[in-house]
Each structure stands twice: as C-alpha cells, then as structure tokens.
Amino acid sequence: MSAQPISDFYAYPDAAGHFGQFGGRFVAETLIGPLQELSAAYDQARQDPSFIAEYDKDLKHYVGRPSPIYHAERLSREVGGAQILLKREDLNHTGAHKINNTIGQALLASRMGKTRIIAETGAGQHGVASATVAARLGLECVVYMGATDIERQKINVYRMKLLGATVIPVTSGSATLKDALNEAMRDWVTNVRDTFYIIGTVAGPDPYPRMVRDFNAIVGREAREQMLQDYGRLPDAISACVGGGSNAIGLFHAFLNDPGVKIYGAEAAGDGIATGRHAASIAAGRPGVLHGNRTYVICDDDGQITETHSISAGLDYPGVGPEHSFLSDSGRAVYQGITDDEAMAAFHLLAHTEGILAALESSHAVAQSIKLARELPRDALVLCNLSGRGDKDVHTIAAREGIAL
C-alpha cells in the first residue's frame, strides 16, 4: 500500500461520499432515492441549531456524557512502559459507545416523520442502543441479528425484548453480522416509506459512513479537550478496536490533523491471521465492494466474501468502514491484528488490576495498548478507547474457559 500525502483529513469524504478510492454508493436502483432523501435530511439537520441542541441535551442528560478519561495506574505499572489511559465509553447509558450514534439517528428519524426503525446487530450493543432510543422516542423497533450471535449474546437479546423491540434471527450465510445487515437492507427497501434504517457502524453506502462518524465524533472531541485540560498535552498514541470501526473513527477523528498523535486500530485476528480464521479486513483483506461501499474486505481470489471468525461478535465482520481503509492507505493510521487469546489475556489483566470488565471488542484495543505501552517510555501517554463493558460477554468467556454458569 503506497501512502498518499494528505494535507487535510477533514476534507473527506467528497461530495459523492468518497474517501479517496473508498466509500461511495454501490446499491440497487431502488435504494438511490431513499439514500438521497436521507442525505438531504441529514445535511439539513446537522446545520440546524435546534437539532444540534436536542442531540447535545440527550447526550448530557440521557446518555450521561461526558465520559471520563481514567488513568489505569496499576495496569500501567504491571505492563511497564507508557501510561495507559482509558476513555470510558463503557460508562454510557446502555454500556457502550453505540448510543452516541443511535440517539442521533433516531432524532433524525423522528424529524423525517418515520415511525419505525430497524437495525442490525452483532454483539447486541447496537441493537440494545437502538431499542433504547426507540422506547425513548416512541418508535417501533425491529432488530436483525445472526442466529450465531443470538446464541452467544443471549443477555443482550433479552435486553432488547425488555425494551420493546422485536428481534428477528437471521440464519443465512454464517448467521452473523454481515448477514443481519443484508436482511435489514432488504427490509428497508420494502418498507422505506415509514422505516428508518439505523446502521450501527461507519460502513454502508453514503451518507452512513460520515453520519455515523459525526455522531460518534463526540468521543474524540471530548478526549482531546480532556487530555489538554488534565495532562496539558495530547496523547502520544491512541488505540481503538475496529470491526466496522465506529468507536474507532469516533476517537480518531479529532486527532487526524495532529501529526504528533500516532493512531492504531486493533482488528480481530481470531485464531491468527495465518490460520484464515480471523476478521482482520485491513491487515489481511483487499479492496472490494460490500454493503454499498468500496472498502477492504475479506474475500477469496474470485472476490467472493468469505466467512470470518472472532471470539468477539462485534468484530466478526468481513469488511471495515471506508474511512479506515483510506486512513490505512494514506499511512495516517496503522491497523494490527489482535488474536482471541491476546484479547482474553487483556480482559483478565484489566479486570485484575483495575476492577474493570471490558467488552471482548474493547479488550482487543486494551491488548494493543499494552503492546504499545511496552514499546514507549514511562512518560508517554497511550489513550485507549474502552468502547463497551463486558457484562454481555461473561457467558462467552466462561464457556471458553470450561466454566459452567
């Protein structure tokens, strides 16, 4: 991959939704109209002070923002090297960063006069966040979820139902996140008149990658301000897990034009990239088209999407948001694979040293931050996005370790 010199990362996407060669709108003709309607409505809303004020109000009083930055002192001492700081998105209402985006899109849905929202989910956090805001705004909610993910995320499935959502199992393909997204798109095409599709990550056709990024960008804006206020400087490195990549781009975006801040994404290496059982789209994929946008995907020599594997349902996706593909090719961000075993070890170490149960997704970023810290001096600062809490993963972890609950 050859690096392209970029003078201003905030100039992207362009008017057609492209991040360099990535992004765009590769969809059936039946979706062009709905996407144009959505794009126009979003562009109008994002410039409306009353919409922004309503969104900010909900972030403060409903979500509980700002989320703090916590200095993981015992973890840092245990690891040696740089100081590890955690952006505590796990403390948000519903337990993850996902609600930053769902509250924004649900407010937009109401503004557009839609009465029904649909969503896809992998780990269940986006489904829970969508069901939550639907209840908050009095909207019908249908969540599509792969049957494999339903089995490994039973707690979140029940949470969605408690919140009034209908959860529809998807059994096609590998019965995971990509298949749930396919079914949700089919629903949207059929019911577009009254239905708003809340995509949970920075993938999909334009305007979704930029819209989901914008609603999650509060994470990085807060973090940048908190770093300057509490530490008097920006971090030396930042890290976040990357499946589709919404929590990561939310953190990264505020630092893109700060060359002194190194940016790292932690992809799911599963059993190891060499085994083929992984979900590391950038580290081991190639450019292709998936779910309406051009990006790095995991596919065979004929361009067919292949099955992925990760212990983390939220990272078990054969693509990645197009802006991440662009940041990788430009050289601005580095994406590394973290194995299931490395994520598990980081989960346990964080729990034992800091009393924090991180989501398995977030544990990939913790593992990456530990590696980075060991390579840096003690006065360096590594900021890790702790994107979600691990309550939902306790059964998965226990089962992997042979413990019956």
Swiss-Prot record:
InterPro entries per record: Trp_synth_b_CS, Trp_synth_beta, Trp_synth_beta/beta-like, TrpB-like_PALP, TrpB-like_PALP_sf
Protein name: Tryptophan synthase beta chain
Keyword Iron-sulfur: no
Amino-acid biosynthesis as UniProt keyword: yes
Annotated gene: trpB
Record-linked Pfam families: PALP (PF00291)
Entry's Gene Ontology molecular function annotations: tryptophan synthase activity
Class of this enzyme: lyase
Reaction catalysis annotation: (1S,2R)-1-C-(indol-3-yl)glycerol 3-phosphate + L-serine = D-glyceraldehyde 3-phosphate + L-tryptophan + H2O
Keywords of this entry: Amino-acid biosynthesis, Aromatic amino acid biosynthesis, Lyase, Pyridoxal phosphate, Tryptophan biosynthesis
Family the entry assigns: Belongs to the TrpB family.
Cofactor(s) recorded in Swiss-Prot or TrEMBL: pyridoxal 5'-phosphate
Any one Gene Ontology cellular component term annotated for this protein: cytoplasm
Lineage, top ranks: Bacteria, Pseudomonadati, Pseudomonadota, Gammaproteobacteria, Lysobacterales
Disulphide linkage map: none
Pathway: Amino-acid biosynthesis; L-tryptophan biosynthesis; L-tryptophan from chorismate: step 5/5
Summary of subunit composition and partner proteins: Tetramer of two alpha and two beta chains.
